[in-house]
Amino acid sequence: MARTDDDNWDLTSSVGVTATIVAVGRALATKDPRGLINDPFAEPLVRAVGLDLFTKMMDGELDMSTIADVSPAVAQAMVYGNAVRTKYFDDYLLNATAGGIRQVAILASGLDSRAYRLPWPTRTVVYEIDQPKVMEFKTTTLADLGAEPSAIRRAVPIDLRADWPTALQAAGFDSAAPTAWLAEGLLIYLKPQTQDRLFDNITALSAPGSMVATEFVTGIADFSAERARTISNPFRCHGVDVDLASLVYTGPRNHVLDYLAAKGWQPEGVSLAELFRRSGLDVRAADDDTIFISGCLTDHSSISPPTAAGWR
């Protein structure tokens, strides 16, 4: 089904199911003996979503090599890709708070459990923004598990295509305080102009010393429907409602490194291969064109007030 400007989802459909797939990756990486990450909430959250394929993966009845019809080595590289991505953003947030930042905003948080699993400094406030159905599911499921946030967690149930800056501030966000922003696994699901508006609003809400992290798929402009079907079909054959070709926005868009730099940030990018190398993994398995980006805001000259106008 084609995307619309007001489409919505839960964790079993549309963009929402991709959040569940990413959580599956974190659960598998947590089980991996290398111990690159530890997300104890990924597996119970995946099980609570209730999709049979993912439950069987958690039980060890199915693995990625069988599902995607790839070699065990390629399947393992997929797990490592999730692990190093998660570790990169974990380290970014921990470094930001170690530097004194006490306000964190996680955009399109999905089944992200960092507000519960990371060792946050005292008085750190973590804002999570996502679709209302997604936020309600995660909050309720983690409460039923007896999980307690390790930070002051504030859920902001709103679509990022709506006026989320106003909703964020209504939840207590202080734009005068430095913030660590995280936009993980998000940009490919946004129109090019919506991606720009996202970073415009982040910049407008950011005090000097704020930080931002995201990832940018350099080949998204040329991402073909055939490639999308190749990725989606193994899941669809097992009853998962995902059609990547209809979810991803392709075509030319601004490179995030350039766009952030023009807005007064000092961003730096690192390749997936480099993240593999840092973790002692075979870089030949990192055949992905994703760049992981983080940076600090030092210049306010390009800032204008946040707005939802033209968000879609």
Swiss-Prot record:
Enzyme Commission number(s) from the entry: 2.1.1.-
Family affiliation: Belongs to the UPF0677 family.
GO biological process, one term: methylation
Source organism, top-level taxon: Bacteria
Assigned keywords, A-Z: Methyltransferase, S-adenosyl-L-methionine, Transferase
GO molecular function terms attached to this record: methyltransferase activity
Name recorded for this polypeptide: Putative S-adenosyl-L-methionine-dependent methyltransferase Rv1729c
Disulfide topology: none
Record organism: Mycobacterium tuberculosis (strain ATCC 25618 / H37Rv)
GO cellular component, one term: plasma membrane
Role description: Exhibits S-adenosyl-L-methionine-dependent methyltransferase activity.
NCBIfam families, sorted: mthyl_TIGR00027
Top EC class, one word: transferase
Residues bound to S-adenosyl-L-methionine: D130, D159, L160
